[in-house]
């Protein structure tokens, strides 16, 4: 809220905080624990508060990021003596140049039956995925991608909303060393082509539709257009998020739009297409992931 002082200058009044953490929560916070590590390693640094820690983090860049690396216990096959090279270049700076690691391996390190992801669609459909189940799903899709020839440096795209299957596809692609790119299915066709056309993906994960403003919106016609235009695509993987494309009750649903590895559906529109759920079932016995560690 703003007001003016006696000389007509704008003065901002601070509103009362909506919420404050308890002392117990502050003590258990990761930032508090990290500050204690910094204070132990660098006794001369005042790390007692965020305001005190921040100036050090941006003036002693190498020390700060080395502490972050160690505190996070990053999984890597090779660590790096150098933290950052050419820091004055932006872009151009190189971080931990000798390290080899995998993004997905670090994100999937936790196991157990605790909830890893909560997905809630606009229509009210809610799913919870445990850390164990997430790892299993990623293992299956990674195996499917590998069998399809996806290798380090290949591009995998997602024409997907923010749902569990999107996270699974991203982690599966990055576990293999592939590059992930995505955009929402409510993008217009040209907007999608401007993004995906540049990276030339080998595989496209695409939702059959999405929910918005109380309605289910079909995406399959747009997916068909994208598949026809991107010559690099070797596989389209359809994720069934809506039960059936609106106004196509007589078309046979999603399966009738697919060709390629879907048996018994010759009157179709999307070439080289498979169902995400079929990939999961086919590779359900895969329980481990061979993470590709890269520089």
Kindly give the residue locations of the regions a language model identified:
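N-terminal amphipathic, basic-rich helices that act as targeting or association modules
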Residues: 10-91
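AMP-dependent adenylate-forming
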Residues: 36, 40-45, 104-133, 244-247
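Conserved AMP-binding/adenylate-forming core of the ANL superfamily
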Residues: 52-56, 117-171, 188-193, 267, ...
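A short N-terminal helical cap/helix-turn-helix that marks the beginning
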Residues: 66-80, 97-118
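ANL superfamily adenylate-forming
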Residues: 123, 203-295
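Short beta-strand->loop structural element characteristic of the AMP-binding/adenylate-forming
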Residues: 157-160, 166, 170, 174-226
């Amino acid at each position: 809220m703003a007001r003016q002082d006696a000389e007509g200058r704008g003065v901002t009044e601070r509103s009362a905080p909506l919420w404050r953490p308890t002392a117990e929560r502050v003590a258990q916070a990761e930032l508090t624990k990290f500050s204690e590590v910094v204070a132990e390693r660098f006794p001369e640094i005042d790390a007692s508060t965020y305001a005190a820690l921040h100036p050090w983090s941006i003036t002693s860049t190498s020390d700060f990021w080395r502490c972050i690396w160690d505190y996070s216990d990053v999984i890597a096959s090779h660590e790096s003596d150098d933290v950052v090279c050419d820091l004055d270049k932006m872009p151009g700076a190189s971080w931990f140049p000798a390290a080899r690691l995998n993004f997905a391996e670090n994100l999937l390190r936790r196991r157990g039956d605790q909830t890893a992801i909560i997905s809630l669609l606009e229509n009210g459909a809610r799913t919870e995925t445990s850390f164990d189940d997430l790892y299993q799903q990623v293992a299956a899709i990674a195996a499917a991608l590998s069998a399809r020839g996806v290798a380090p440096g290949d591009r995998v795209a997602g024409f997907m909303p923010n749902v569990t299957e999107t996270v699974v596809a991203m982690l599966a692609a990055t576990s293999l060393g592939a590059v992930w790119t995505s955009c929402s299915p409510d993008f217009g066709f040209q907007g999608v082509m401007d993004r995906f056309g540049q990276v030339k993906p080998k595989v496209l994960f695409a939702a059959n539709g999405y929910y918005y403003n109380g309605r289910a919106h079909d995406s399959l016609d747009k997916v068909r257009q994208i598949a026809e235009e991107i010559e690099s695509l070797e596989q389209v993987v359809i994720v069934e998020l809506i039960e059936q494309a609106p106004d196509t009750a007589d078309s046979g649903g999603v399966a009738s739009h697919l060709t390629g590895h879907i048996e018994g559906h010759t009157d179709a529109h999307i070439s080289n297409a498979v169902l995400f759920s079929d990939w999961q079932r086919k590779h359900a016995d895969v329980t481990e992931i061979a993470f590709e560690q890269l520089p």
